[in-house]
Amino acid sequence: MPDHNNDITQSPSLDRDCTTLSRHVLQQLQSFDTAAQDISAIMNRIALAGKLVARRLSRAGLMEGVLGFTGEENVQGESVKRMDLYANDVFISVFKQSGLVCRLASEEMEKPYYIPENCPIGRYTLLYDPIDGSSNVDINLNVGSIFSIRQQEGMDLDGDAADLLQNGHKQIAAGYILYGPSTMLVYSIGTGVHSFILDPSLGEFILAEENITMPNHGSIYSVNEGNFWQWEDSIRDYIRYMHRHEGYTARYSGALVGDLHRILMQGGVFLYPGTKKKPEGKLRLLYETAPLAWLIEQAGGKASTGTMPLLDFVPTYLHQRTPTILGSVENVELVESFIQEAERETVGV
């Protein structure tokens, strides 16, 4: 007689404790009060947006009007890809009429998107990069979404969202969704870093790894060396050091989430420094580097601008950029040492 119980236990979807994202968030918050349930519900909506984007990406090459550019530019002066626009609209759609967030701010919008009917009760703001690394979409390489949740402070009657211009320690939660061989969601609410994999058979993000911890040192450095001659001497000296010393290897995909995920899991350093012409760098603080810095430090790593802790940096406007160094403590401190040495030489110390 067939053992149906054994068939069930051998099911691929049931080969581990199926801890879902919403259950895990509530466990981490150790509460079932209204605030905890709000954060859990927001995370569920973010997960829904990730599922919708992942579905679109999986069929992008088979559908018309998905790949390529829209012909428009965003507030950053960058050409907008169709997937950028689609993913941005997805995040807005899943939070409309949710009662959970009052504002959404993203790379694709000059000003925050307000949901007035949510504002009396949804005292949260979602900041996000809907598709990071969108240049990879057309060639079927990894891309991701980055998100940060902040508590709204004050009434924001002027609609200028000035309360968002605070340091990264003010984040309530942050994370990213990586669209790769599997779709993975990584998040932290200040109690460690945890990863979830989307199980297509269940339609749920299932806990894959809890309390991810980075090694203090890693062999990987991730940087766009095509910018070598645009960097300050300190960064060029650091790269030359990497080239001269054995035990280091370069990995760079052009997708921040993919490169950062490798560093998070294996150790090493990701850097996107400023250039001589643009010392502020390329990456935006509030919805790109601050959320990732939050994750890195929660996992035991270090996040820096090169001259100060990245999470201490206070922006003066919504889309402010900052030089970025993220990774294992020893690797980040090595980069910082080159910058500090250059500063000492400049002042003659």
From Swiss-Prot:
PROSITE patterns: FBPASE (PS00124). Its cofactor is Mg(2+). It is found in: Cytoplasm. It holds the Pfam family FBPase. GO terms for molecular function: fructose 1,6-bisphosphate 1-phosphatase activity; magnesium ion binding. One of its GO terms (biological process) is sucrose biosynthetic process. Its main location: cytoplasm. Keywords: Calvin cycle, Carbohydrate metabolism, Cytoplasm, Hydrolase, Magnesium, Metal-binding. Binds 2 magnesium ions per subunit. Substrate binds at residues 132-135, 224, 252, 282. Mg(2+) 1 binds at residues 107, 129, 131. Coiled coil: none annotated. Its EC number is 3.1.3.11. It catalyses: beta-D-fructose 1,6-bisphosphate + H2O = beta-D-fructose 6-phosphate + phosphate. Pathway: Carbohydrate biosynthesis; Calvin cycle. GO terms for cellular component: cytosol. InterPro entries: FBPase_C_dom (IPR044015), FBPase_class-1 (IPR000146), FBPase_N (IPR033391), FBPtase (IPR028343), Fructose_bisphosphatase_AS (IPR020548). Mg(2+) 2 binds at residues 129, 132, 288. Homotetramer. HAMAP family: FBPase_class1. Belongs to the FBPase class 1 family. This is Fructose-1,6-bisphosphatase class 1. It comes from Picosynechococcus sp. (strain ATCC 27264 / PCC 7002 / PR-6). The lineage of its organism: Bacteria, Bacillati, Cyanobacteriota, Cyanophyceae, Oscillatoriophycideae.
